[in-house]
């Protein structure tokens, strides 16, 4: 009887551990929105290290003004060029649509890039999708897609 109780206790511990591992990396909507807000703050302040660190090591950026980029180094190079624009900022135009996908969160919506070119303000309305996933307790953008909206 005592051995049986130990076996049940051991099985319970294993199941509890497996459930913890499965759900501990689940991203909440609040965490994903926090990453979105942090991304905007880093973008508006041209904080290169901050914005690059919003992405996972192997993050993918399908950029508005360039190519498909994979990894932080490629993403960094993209933002180095983009951050050269004067009066650069981004504004979210709506509340993001939220979808949970296997522990990750996808946020989609519209934003507008603003910058000065030849002394004239330019505004580029674009669509976005951010997929956020938690790794080792931190939420990262694993994929971002951005394209000009007509």
Q: Which sequence ranges carry the predicted segments?
A:
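Disulfide-bonded cysteine motifs in exported proteins
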Residues: 1-4, 27
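Hydrophobic alpha-helical topogenic segments used for membrane insertion/localization
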Residues: 3-22
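A beta-strand edge to alpha-helix "cap/lid" segment located at domain peripheries
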Residues: 8, 23-35, 40-50, 60-150
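Helix-to-beta-strand junctions that scaffold the AdoMet/dcAdoMet cofactor pocket
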Residues: 56
């Amino acid at each position: 009887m005592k051995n049986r109780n130990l076996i049940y206790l051991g099985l319970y511990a294993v199941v509890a551990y497996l459930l913890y591992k499965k759900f501990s990396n689940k991203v909440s909507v609040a965490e994903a929105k926090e990453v979105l807000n942090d991304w905007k703050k880093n973008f508006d302040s041209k904080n290169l290290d901050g914005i690059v660190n919003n992405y996972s090591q192997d993050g993918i950026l399908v950029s508005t003004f360039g190519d498909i980029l994979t990894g932080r180094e490629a993403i960094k190079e993209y933002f180095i060029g983009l951050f050269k624009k004067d009066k650069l900022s981004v504004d979210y135009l709506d509340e993001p649509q939220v979808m949970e996908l296997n522990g990750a969160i996808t946020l989609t919506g519209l934003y507008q890039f603003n910058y000065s070119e030849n002394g004239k303000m330019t505004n580029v309305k674009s669509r976005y999708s951010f997929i956020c996933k938690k790794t080792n307790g931190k939420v990262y953008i694993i994929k971002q897609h951005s394209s000009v909206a007509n």
